[in-house]
């Protein structure tokens, strides 16, 4: 069976999607096809494909779920909101192809609130393989983007303390005017160039989670900076390293990467490698089909069922309504539980 990965194809404002696809490709026996996540129905004529459907969901829910010739492997997925779960068709699709591996706890809670067996997988970019930079390792690299740019004053301060002249590179993608497959080719090349640049640096300072995680995976010293270190979206990185408060940079004496749980990082990398290998071997979701993942399958079903029943009871009793609203859209939850 042929294999595919997916990337953002509509607005093209997230090189992180490309890096997540590369993280899967690192462990595949052959180069995968690349599909447009926002236009998967276009792949209906390509024959049967095993699709690693990790990444961010999504700009346009009207073209979801994917056509039946695609066998989706849902792990390391992130939902920006609960809109994707407002259609019964989508919920049944996820149940059919579950258990679903979520990239973050918020997505996990949304899936469980919809009664979908699910588990926490973290982000696949934590398992990217090291690249060769082709040159001596030197200097400090500052990686940000237009949506979250480090102030010049902060960059200068970091460089002064480290005695390094910082180099800046953008994490933003390019090629918005190109047809999809040309964009895919150029964006993969651009992402690989970024990975090689990270590996050629003594230290990386970044505001981007999909720069920090690849650096951790490849053994590059990295500092993740954010104005709100406790933000839930940062959790896939925060479980491995300390997130530095952007507003307190001037109070730090060191900018070394702080890996809080290196053993956990190595275990996650092995899990990702085993997961992808098992998916290829069984031609589907290994958590559903491989005996090796049977305990995780049972736990995902049990935990999700318990969560679903608890939330349904709370919703009917009017308990913690505001808190529930932060996890899922109350209207869609009410529709599914009546």
What do the PLM-derived regions correspond to, one by one?
Residues 1-338:
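Active-site anion-handling motifs in enzyme catalytic cores
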